[in-house]
Regions:
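Extended alpha-helical interface modules used as scaffolds for assembling large macromolecular complexes
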Residues: 1-175
Length: 175
């Protein structure tokens, strides 16, 4: 699965609220050309919503897919995190996040996050779209920690890159 996600260059947030038609599901698993049906067939995605529209000549069906539950979402993120982001300070970052959850002290977590990002090889820091790259990494990292986080959240003022909901505070993160 991790090799397929890498092959198709997809990010975790690409699977949140994915819309597709029924015809997209009819692909044999042994000849994967689209990862969404594979994730659906293997249980990583489930149907969250269904809409149908009747036209003069056809019935248009749209399915909205998403993770079936938080455990599946977190497990996939943790696998991606460990497989793709092989840096030395991941344990320290996880510990800092747990402290952040308990004490609501974002400053310490941000310091550990900076150290974490500094551990990436130079070649990873020069990807074509740095903002998208770091957006995806931060989303995957926080999701692997079990965070209540959403990507590209629309608000009255525009679209927030990430929204992290804590027990007492909501953080809007712009990258």
């Amino acid at each position: 699965l991790l090799k397929l996600i890498n092959k198709f260059d997809l990010k975790m947030e690409d699977f949140e609220n994915t819309e597709c038609r029924a015809s997209r599901f009819n692909q044999p698993v042994e000849k994967v050309t689209d990862l969404v049906p594979f994730l659906f067939q293997s249980g990583y995605l489930t149907i969250k919503d269904y809409k149908s529209f009747i036209t003069d000549s056809d019935i248009m069906e749209t399915y909205t897919l998403g993770y079936p539950n938080g455990e599946v979402r977190t497990a996939l993120a943790d696998s991606l995190f460990r497989n793709y982001y092989k840096v030395n300070d991941s344990i320290a970052l996880r510990t800092a996040y747990m402290d952040f959850m308990q004490n609501d002290d974002i400053d310490v977590f941000i310091e550990h996050l900076k150290i974490f990002f500094d551990g990436f090889p130079f070649s990873m820091n020069n990807e074509k779209e740095n903002e998208l790259h770091y957006h995806s990494i931060l989303y995957t990292v926080l999701t692997s920690f079990g965070a209540d986080i959403s990507a590209n959240q629309e608000t009255a003022l525009g679209k927030a890159d990430l929204v992290l909901k804590m027990p007492k505070t909501i953080y809007v993160i712009e990258i």
